[in-house]
């Protein structure tokens, strides 16, 4: 790259700081990396220029020589060096390059071995409750099938009396290092060991119960305590009742999803209960004592005289128990006044007398369409 301005290649002004040089290189190296621009010769050449410029400007002696004489004058007059030492000096650049190469660069973050402790998977179970069960609480038994550690081998996967052996290919690390030659030099990457599958151990004599897996499917009956006050959409967590962990890892959790069947009479909103009650016109007018159903049983309630249809009365503390404490909600009673559709002679006569006593009968005779057109 004779007669080219290294600062210009990296998009910098002469005299740029080490930090500015490093940041510029990171940005351009990712943009023009060959694995990100396969088949693009122009990008490949640009990447070579970027690396050559960085090798000069990142080295204090070469940079000083270049700034003074316009040439780095280092052995070979160019080249790209050996990158087998990894990208440790570039912070997280090695992690970014991992996505290009599909493996870990030496000096970068290491992969987790498959024989490391792993938390078990969480599970979900939906349970249906009656209105009463949700309101008062209940204990239910459910049947689930989950993955558990094999009792025969203790979860090792090896036949009883034996144990897994360290993989002779990866030395128990679960990964192997592979050197790749690129236009930039040699890159060392890590990949999962193909002999042990990344576990770091090999089972020569597998357990006859789990066939080397270390875990088996088991059916279990679990008792679930449903607290009073739950409603549709609530979820109850059962810690540690999910699938067992692997390699000594903790078990997952079991989440119980609640669905409540609607009641024929009561309607629930939050922790309050709503109910409609029907009374006759005379009772609404004169007032009456009546029996109102609640979740605790029937209670006596006095409907005051002159109650209009649609009036709502509150029965304090007759609602649902709050799950996390704080007392109970209320029950609201909506009064619906029924108008009779069929009257016998006695009822009709009584209503006429009521109308006359109310001063409505005479007014009614003089009203209507005939009077309107007179």
From Swiss-Prot:
Zn(2+) 2 binds at residues 167, 170, 193, 196. This is Chaperone protein DnaJ. Homodimer. The J domain is necessary and sufficient to stimulate DnaK ATPase activity. Zinc center 1 plays an important role in the autonomous, DnaK-independent chaperone activity of DnaJ. Zinc center 2 is essential for interaction with DnaK and for DnaJ activity. It comes from the Bacteria. Binds 2 Zn(2+) ions per monomer. Residues 5-70 form the J domain. The gene is dnaJ.
